Amino acid sequence: MWFHLLAADYDGTLASDGRIAPDTLAALRRVRESGRRVLLVTGRQLDDLLRVCPEIEIFDLVVAENGAVLFDPHARHVEDLGDPPSTAFLAGLAQLGVPFSTGRIIVSTVVPYERQVLATIRSLGLELQIVFNKESVMVLPSGVSKESGLRAALRRLGLSRHNTVGVGDAENDDAFLARTGFAVAVANAVPALAARADLVTTVPDGAGVRELIDGSLLADLVAFRPRLLERTIPLGAAEDGHEVRYPIRGPNLLITGDSGTGKCTLTGVLVEHLLHQDYVVWLLDPEGDYRTLADHEGIVVLSSAPGSEATRAGEVERLLRHRLTSVVIDLSGLDREEKIRATARFLHGVQRLRTQTGAPHWVLVDQAHHVFPPGRGQAGEGFDFEWSGVCLVTGEPESVAPEVLDVAGHVLSTSIEVVTERLRLLGRADVPGGVPLGTGEALSITLGDGAARRVERFRVAPRTTTHTPVASAG
């Protein structure tokens, strides 16, 4: 299961005339029964929401007041995500005859009073923003939005935006839907929102949400795989200048090439672009080649030594579950047998985490021949290699257990000889010989039925962090 969270707007999406229909509530229960979470993201003031929605506990969390308030309906805990409006601001609105209501943080009025609101903000020199929701006008602290509220909720739930399906109908839903892994507009959505959505339902509000849940979400959106494959990362430029890209949820990868031909650079480019797009990456590093990735925000390098944190799978699980942290596991301080055993432990832990949260999104194993040698493929037993987002990196593909090597459906190679000779002999990629690759060049090879369906030569994009080889300990 990839999509673990449904994040939905209230008015005009889940609710019609202020209420959620019984059939829609039943559909939300089916989402929760599937093991997924449900998040409400609404512009309504919290007190008002609790009045009109007695079934509030159907949600795991609530983002209210357009991102300004985070509410746990089970613990009844409220967290303000911004500062309340000043007395001077409220007095200024009243003086201009603006009808308004206040929540914990939000100030709400209606069109056409946005002009008086803006005049008051300017006259007092306040750092406030105006947000429109059809005929409603909301005033919030700068930087507060449904998107910022979504981020706070995801941190609390320990989930990633990429494992979230969002659904809404109005202008103020745009920012938060853009941050989800799949954006849905109900049929009654404003045209601008519908134009940017991945899917527009055929029926409005709650009926549209039911259509999404029963027709797509409970099947993990498998019918929309072509749309999901459009999310790509750049790898470099082809000879004719066009950008060579790889689908983030494409086939599992094998990155290969002789020593010194740039396969670590190519791997680093892949990882850096995944990190830039907020994907959670788990990289097993038997030789300590990727320590410099610690320069990236949101990634932790765990050092290796017998009994260190890098050999305790529980430490990695804790980081991933609670902080959505990308991790490099540096195993260079272990001997080969210890590396194989540590790999088995880590993959077992990561499999559990993927089942629970969908993350880490990518699992990369460098020097795969060290930890998956022929006859020792059991290091990967219990790990679902069929899940997209697996990358094996090795200069010796012939020294990787065949049952592990078989998971790759795409090859990136920095050495034409490795492809035309070693992989061809293994029956993995029947690629004809060609002009040797120059420095910084690579091949992108789509596999199918033991042959290459497509071969593309490209120049690898530069890395943003340096590669510093470290001597292997085993």
Please state what every model-predicted region is.
Residues 229-362, 372-399, 403-412, 474:
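P-loop NTPase catalytic phosphate-binding loop
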Residues 17-105:
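Active-site phosphate-binding/coordination module
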Residues 1-2, 21, 140, 147-229:
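Mg2+-dependent phosphoryl-transfer enzymes with acidic/Ser/Thr/Gly-rich catalytic loops
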Residues 233-234, 240, 256, 437-474:
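Conserved P-loop NTPase motor module
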Residues 389, 394-450:
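Conserved ATP-driven motor cores of ASCE-family P-loop NTPases powering translocation/secretion/packaging/pilus
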Residues 2-18, 177:
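Asp-based phosphoryl-transfer active-site loop
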Residues 86-179, 188:
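Conserved acidic, metal-coordinating active-site core of Asp-based
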